[in-house]
Curated annotation (Swiss-Prot):
Probable regulator of osteoblast differentiation. Plays essential roles in both eye and limb development. GO terms for cellular component: basement membrane; extracellular region. Residues 36-88 form the Kazal-like domain. Residues 369-404, 406-441 form the EF-hand domain. InterPro entries: Dev_reg/Prot_inhib, EF-hand-dom_pair, EF_Hand_1_Ca_BS, Kazal_dom, Kazal_dom_sf, SMOC1_EC, SPARC/Testican_Ca-bd-dom, Thyroglobulin_1. Its main location: secreted. Keywords: Basement membrane, Calcium, Developmental protein, Differentiation, Disulfide bond, Extracellular matrix, Glycoprotein, Metal-binding, Repeat, Secreted, Signal. This is SPARC-related modular calcium-binding protein 1. Residues 91-157, 234-302 form the Thyroglobulin type-1 domain. The gene is Smoc1. Ca(2+) 2 binds at D419, N421, D423, E430. One of its GO terms (biological process) is eye development.
Length: 463
C-alpha cells in the first residue's frame, strides 16, 4: 500500500493521474475515435436481437451490449452508466460527467472532482479540483494533459493542443516532474510525450509538479518539528494502518488509503484504494508502490516478496567520516546543502535566463527528485564537459558549500569527503554519493530508508 506520505491521495485525483498515461499500451496522438470502422478487432458482427439499450459515459445510447463493446474497443475509457437509454440523448460527455459527479458529490465521504462545461457542452480548457486547489489543462475530450497541473493558480492553456508545434527554444526551461506518472502507466512503460499529451505553454512557470510531490510535501511537513532520530524511524505496516485509520476517522472526506498488512509488520504485495477501484503492487517491507503496476477493477499480478534493495552495505559514504564536522552533524549538513541545491535548481529553471546559459535539459523521468538535483548541479560545475569536476571547477563548489550549508565546520573538508578515490577530481557518482542521493527513494545513502529530516524544499516552489 502507499506509505503514509502519499496516502492522502484523493480518489478522483488518482484517476486524473491515471488518465495522464496512455491506456492499454496504445500510443496514439489523437482521439481513439479515429480508428477505422474497417478495423476487424473493433468491428465485430452484432446479431439482430431484441434491443437492450445501454447508456454509456460518452452520453450515447447503444442498442445492445455488442454495439457498446464495439465502441469500447475504439475508446477503452468508455464505461456503462446504466442500463436503458440515456435520459438526455443529446447530452454532451462533459455535461453527463458533470451530472454524475454532482450526484456523487452528495456523499459526504467523497472529495469529488466536478468538471466544468462550456455553453456548447464541451469541456472548458482549464479544469480544477476545488478541494485541493489543483488546476490543469484538458483536451477537447476532457482528458488531462500531462505536464499542466498547478496548485492555487490557473495554468496557461494556450490554443488547441494539436494546433501548436512543439517548441525547441524553451525546452531548457520546461521540466515535467512526473515522478508519479509511471505508477499508473497501464502497460508498465514510461510516458511518451506526444502532440496530445505534451503541449507547450506560454509563460515561465515550471510545468506539472505531480501529486507525488504534493503528498511528499504533506508528509515531510509533518516532520519539520521532529528530531532527526524520530524522522529516521521506519514504521511498520501495522503502525501506518493505525495512523491511516485515525486520519480517515478525523478526515472522512479525504479518501485516505488504508494499507493492508501481512504478519510481521509487512505490507501485503497488492494494495487497493476501495473508493476508486485501483490496485497496485508494492514492496512488502516499505509499502512503496511499484511503477507500472496500477490496474482498475482487476487484481494486478505482483511478486509475493518484493523488497527494497539494501543500499547501506554498498554505500561507501554511509560510515565515511567528514573531517572537522561535529559528531552527529553530518546528516544535518548534507540535508541543508541538498535543500539549498534544490531551491537553486528550481529558481534556475523558473528564471527567464537560467544559470549556465540555459544548459538545463529535460531530465530523465525515471530519476528521483534528488537525482535530478545532483545531475543538474554536476552539469553546472562541469564547464568543460569532461564528466568530472577538476580542481579549477571545484572552487565555486567549495564557495557554494561554505555559503549555503550548515553547520559551517562541516564545509571545510567536504570536497575531500566527496573525492572517494582521492584522484583530485569528483565524478558524478561521487557527487551523488556524498550528497546521499540514491536511486531507491531519493536520499538513501546518508538518510536511512529515504526519509530526510526537515521541511520538503519544494513547498511553495513547485506547487
Amino acid at each position: 500500500m502507499l506509505p503514509a506520505r502519499v496516502r492522502l491521495l484523493t480518489p478522483h485525483l488518482l484517476l486524473v493521474l491515471v488518465q495522464l498515461s496512455p491506456a492499454g499500451g496504445h500510443r496514439t496522438t489523437g482521439p481513439r475515435f479515429l480508428i477505422s470502422d474497417r478495423d476487424p478487432p473493433c468491428n465485430p458482427h452484432c446479431p439482430r436481437t431484441q434491443p437492450k439499450p445501454i447508456c454509456a459515459s460518452d452520453g450515447r445510447s447503444y442498442e445492445s451490449m455488442c454495439e457498446y463493446q464495439r465502441a469500447k474497443c475504439r475508446d477503452p475509457a468508455l464505461a456503462v452508466v446504466h442500463r436503458g437509454r440515456c435520459k438526455d440523448a443529446g447530452q454532451s460527455k462533459c455535461r453527463l460527467e458533470r451530472a454524475q459527479a454532482l450526484e456523487q458529490a452528495k456523499k459526504p465521504q467523497e472529495a469529488v472532482f466536478v468538471p466544468e462545461c462550456g455553453e456548447d457542452g464541451s469541456f472548458t480548457q482549464v479544469q480544477c479540483h476545488t478541494y485541493t486547489g489543483y488546476c490543469w489543462c484538458v483536451t477537447p475530450d476532457g482528458k488531462p494533459i500531462s505536464g499542466s497541473s498547478v496548485q492555487n493558480k490557473t495554468p496557461v492553456c494556450s490554443g488547441p493542443v494539436t494546433d501548436k508545434p512543439l517548441s525547441q527554444g524553451n525546452s531548457g526551461r520546461k521540466v515535467s516532474f512526473r515522478f508519479f506518472l509511471t505508477l499508473n502507466s497501464d502497460d508498465g512503460s514510461k510516458p511518451t510525450p506526444t502532440m496530445e499529451t505534451q503541449p507547450v505553454f506560454d509563460g515561465d512557470e515550471i510545468t506539472a509538479p505531480t501529486l507525488w510531490i504534493k503528498h511528499l510535501v504533506i508528509k515531510d511537513s509533518k516532520l519539520n518539528n521532529t528530531n532527526v532520530r524520530n524522522s529516521e524511524k521506519v514504521h511498520s505496516c501495522d503502525q501506518e494502518r493505525q495512523s491511516a485509520l485515525e486520519e480517515a476517522r478525523q478526515n472522512p472526506r479525504e479518501g485516505i488509503v488504508i494499507p493492508e498488512c501481512a504478519p510481521g509488520g509487512l505490507y501485503k504485495p497488492v494494495q487497493c484504494h476501495q473508493s476508486t477501484g485501483y490496485c497496485w503492487c508494492v514492496l512488502v517491507d516499505t509499502g512503496r508502490p511499484l511503477p507500472g503496476t496500477s490496474t482498475r477493477y482487476v487484481m494486478p499480478s505482483c511478486e509475493s516478496d518484493a523488497r527494497a534493495k539494501s543500499v547501506e552495505a554498498d554505500d561507501p559514504f554511509k560510515d565515511r567520516e567528514l573531517p572537522g564536522c561535529p559528531e552527529g552533524k553530518k546528516m544535518e549538513f548534507i540535508t541543508s546543502l541538498l535543500d539549498a541545491l534544490t531551491t537553486d535548481m528550481v529558481q534556475a529553471i523558473n528564471s527567464a535566463a537560467p544559470t549556465g546559459g540555459g544548459r538545463f535539459s529535460e531530465p530523465d523521468p525515471s530519476h528521483t527528485l534528488e537525482e535530478r538535483v545532483a545531475h543538474w548541479y554536476f552539469s553546472q560545475l562541469d564547464s568543460n564537459s569532461s564528466d568530472d569536476i577538476n580542481k579549477r571547477e571545484m572552487k565555486p563548489f567549495k564557495r557554494y558549500v561554505k555559503k549555503k550549508a550548515k553547520p559551517k565546520k562541516c564545509a571545510r573538508r567536504f570536497t575531500d569527503y566527496c573525492d572517494l578515490n582521492k584522484d583530485k577530481v569528483i565524478s558524478l557518482p561521487e557527487l551523488k554519493g556524498c550528497l546521499g542521493v540514491s536511486k531507491e527513494g531519493g536520499s538513501l545513502g546518508s538518510f536511512p530508508q529515504g526519509k530526510r529530516a526537515g521541511t520538503n524544499p519544494f513547498i511553495g516552489r513547485l506547487v
